[in-house]
Amino acid sequence: MARPALTRDEVLDSAADLVKQHGPAALTMRGLAAELGTAVTSIYWHVGNRESLLDALVERTVADLGEIRPVGRTPARRIASVARALRRQLRDHPHLVAMVHERGLTERMFLPAQQALVREAHAAGLRGARAAEVVRAVQFLVVGHVLVERNRERAPAQRPGEQELWGARTADGDPALVRALARPIDPEKVFTASVKALVAGLLEAAPETARGPDPS
């Protein structure tokens, strides 16, 4: 039985999988052809040379990361949902996001999330500089949190670690704090608490009726 004709989308799907697993350096035309079980000339026919392939992957990544749909009954909860979705996207596509950044398209990549945040800021009664503050603050929190998460994941074992550094003296006589800091960090819990506090602060100036309850 003849193999179905290869499509451009299949080439891009396979290329994206290789980049996600091994990084951009692992993406070669020969390797991609071998992955797809086709000739190198077929890859060139569908996507051009390697630079054209990388450009196509970046364009697709920008489009995919634009699909953020806020959820929740209040602006506060919908803003928090945008933050969670953006963090998840950045966490799930580190190599592809890095490629977007290297090609100078970072701001374009963030535009859909920013527009979603603007709509929710307006829904909460914030406009102008206050709405812009919502956009910037949420974006910076998400990006900063993701960078810290990745840094901790890649960092060598710390000696001394937090458990050794925190004691009765360094914790200002707070044994419950010492016990809490001795436990492994839960990035999801830290992120949720950070977003909740940030959104509550940002919406303080919003009309009470538009603000809604705190994000959960």
Would you name each region that the model predicts?
Residues 19, 54-61, 104, 109, ...:
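Alpha-helical DNA-contacting segments of helix-turn-helix folds
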Residues 67-109, 128-131, 135-138:
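Hydrophobic alpha-helical connector segments
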Residues 52, 81, 95, 112, ...:
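Amphipathic alpha-helical interaction segments
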